[in-house]
Amino acid sequence: PGVASSYRASSARTMAPESYGKYFLIDKIAVGVMAEIFKAKTFGHGGFENLFVVKRILAHMSDNDQFVQMFLDEARVTAVLQHANIVRVVDFGKIGTNYFLAMDCVEGKDSKLILRKLFERRKMLPREFAVYIAMEAAKGLDHAHKKSTNMGQMLQIVHRDVSPSNILVSYAGEVKVADFG
């Protein structure tokens, strides 16, 4: 399920940075029953910084073997999907008893929020923009559906929650499908 459907979304709340492995969690984006999502930074030499999104299993869910397996499967599936229209998983691990995965940070909004804001203003999404978003998302989904192993065996990856909350639009106009879990 997507952030909007399984998490209580919050506008990113600035928080005191929390060190979490090599990441510094700087904003809490959403909290759900099973996991929480943060905007995070890494710091390198010479002032080099990178933004990521870290999805971390809540402590009480780390004992749930079925959920941990689903989380591991999400990480494995998404890690093999390298496409311009899919949010890339860049790291997966365990710190203490908590599993996490780190993804590229898409600076923008999800389509659900865009549609809600337009509705509040009694406006419609321009047809050309709607078609563009749908076509770009379809490119990412098509890549996932056609993904195969090096031996040519189809992986049969299907996104189980294609919804506006899982289609992200960057401020630069990039469209990316998120949350293959």
Describe the residue ranges of each PLM region.
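AlphaC helix of the eukaryotic protein kinase fold
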Residues: 58-80
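AlphaC helix of the protein kinase catalytic domain
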Residues: 111-125
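Conserved N-lobe ATP-binding subsite of Hanks-type protein kinase domains
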Residues: 36
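Conserved short submotifs of the Hanks-type protein kinase catalytic core
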Residues: 96-110, 114
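Activation segment signature within eukaryotic-like protein kinase domains
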Residues: 133-134
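Flexible N-lobe loop architecture of eukaryotic-like protein kinase catalytic domains
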Residues: 30, 73, 81-85, 98, ...
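Protein kinase catalytic-loop region centered on the HRD/HxD motif
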Residues: 138-157
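Activation-segment/catalytic-loop signature of the eukaryotic protein kinase fold
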Residues: 92
